[in-house]
A protein has these predicted regions:
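Glycine-rich phosphate/diphosphate-binding loop of Rossmann-like nucleotide-binding domains
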Residues: 6-24, 104-183, 188
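Generic beta-sheet signal
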Residues: 30, 84, 142, 183, ...
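Short hydrophobic/aromatic-enriched beta-strand-loop microsegments
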Residues: 80-85, 139, 245-248
Length: 248
């Protein structure tokens, strides 16, 4: 397994590497493009990089700040490419992990009602919506107005026959949800290889927080709560030990 990570990562990179090692395979990687010819003076192209990587392993997991980069890599690579997250594009392996968690906990995916809370521009949300279009699952999206589904995304989801609606406040939708998936509304710039902003980056408005009180008074007792992590203040730490949390 080759892991080519042009952006910071904790879970996707380590999870793929751990999985390969547990299966008896081997791993070689780079996790900082600045330490390669793709990130220094030469700015080596994706085409040339993946053609070279193809000689070193059997499959590549790529995370990149450019939307569509893994797709571009797949045009030139002689071995399979797994998308580990591409800019604001998609994050399919994260959603496959979430679907596995739901299947393990609930025994099914079809028929479950989903609630997605957070920034709908995020790659995780895109992959969630596309993934749910393959199942009989209604979903409600809750996000700040400037982070809502784009008209283009809505048209895509309509074409895929996804049963979806939007709500302004999490309290309007949480009571019916079997699965609650949360992402931050305070985001880094995913089009950069590294976002190193310092100081106060703001907090999460109450409309988009999942608190212990909200869960205990509004949510189903057997609902499950997911988060791709890292989190900020959208899920307080005291939720971790409740019956709903499934992000650990």
């Amino acid at each position: 397994l080759l892991t080519a990570f042009y952006q910071p990562s904790t879970r996707p990179r380590l999870a793929h590497e751990a999985a390969m090692l547990r299966l008896g395979g081997k791993v070689t990687c780079f996790s900082d493009a600045k330490m390669t010819r793709a990130g220094d003076f030469y700015q080596e192209s994706i085409k040339d990089t993946v053609k070279m990587l193809g000689f070193y392993g059997d499959v590549i997991v790529m995370r990149h700040f450019q939307q569509g980069a893994p797709h571009e890599a797949a045009k030139w690579a002689s071995i399979p490419i797994i998308n580990g997250g591409d800019g604001w594009g998609e994050h399919p392996t994260q959603i496959l992990t979430d679907f596995y968690t739901v299947l393990r906990e609930k025994g099914r995916i079809d028929g479950l009602k989903w609630l997605a809370v957070g920034d709908m521009r995020m790659r995780t949300m895109h992959s969630l919506a596309y993934g749910l279009s393959q199942f009989d699952c209604p979903i409600t999206f809750v996000s700040p107005p400037d982070m809502s589904l784009t008209d283009e995304m809505k048209a895509d989801l309509t074409n895929y026959n996804l049963n979806f609606r939007e709500a302004e406040h999490v309290e309007q939708a949480i009571a019916d949800a079997d699965v609650i998936l949360v992402e931050p509304v305070v985001q880094p710039d995913y089009t950069k290889s590294r976002d190193e902003r310092s100081g106060d980056v703001g907090g999460t408005p109450s409309n988009y927080k999942i608190t212990r009180e909200l869960l205990s008074t509004k949510a189903k007792s057997d609902a499950i709560l997911l988060h791709s992590l890292p989190r900020m203040d959208e899920i307080p730490a005291d939720v971790d030990i409740t019956r709903w949390s499934r992000y650990w």
